[in-house]
């Protein structure tokens, strides 16, 4: 590659190979062929002290998706991130503890995921990593989906993911017997209308099997990125868990 300037190698390299590499980069300005041990020695001989950052220093350049125009590189400062994490703290801290676990699956190029992961790391909450395409057991073959395998207590998502989870639950219900489908519908109605006795049965029997599809331990979920559909929000609030919504459309 014409841009290559520095080659670092380790172990005992073949002299002929080193000569060939050197001949290819020797004509380039500031080109270096150096052993890893020498890199370590140079570092020890030229120690650089820590350089504390300031609030106005750039922490990240986050690119927008481009859904409403050309993607833009948004410059985020340390102050931006700290303020955002502080707002997430105000929202989530009363409900979380050290025994919680968080399943991360959105790309870190997604600002919601980036901020929430920073928060989880700051408070020492365990993070597991998955993928959108392997979240549910319906999406994979001969193995468990990420939600069932990791069994998180916290989940963050965007509308498309919540719709995927809702469809997974509905497909399981539709594949069940007529009696089980009727029980599910009655349970949704009883909980939505706060009917005490049947609501208890729904929580302990019907919805327990529904929640098993997402690992059975989710206590809270956060939705962002765009408004979640009202029907999906109400369905999952009833059948799965409380979903705190960051965007409202109704």
Can you describe what each PLM-predicted range is?
Residues 82-101, 109-204, 239-240:
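Conserved AMP-binding/adenylation subdomain of ANL enzymes
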Residues 1-41:
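Structural core segment of the AMP-binding/adenylate-forming
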Residues 11, 185, 189-213, 218-241:
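Short gly/Ser/Thr-rich phosphate-binding loop of adenylate-forming enzymes
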Residues 2-6, 31, 125, 217-218, ...:
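A short helix->loop->beta-strand "cap" motif at the edges of active sites that frequently abuts
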Residues 59-85:
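Conserved AMP-binding A3 loop
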Residues 105-110, 226-227:
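Conserved AMP-binding
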Residues 1-3, 16-20, 162-175, 204-216, ...:
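Adenylate-forming
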Residues 27, 32-34, 40-63, 70, ...:
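Conserved pre-ATP/AMP-binding loop-to-beta segment of ANL
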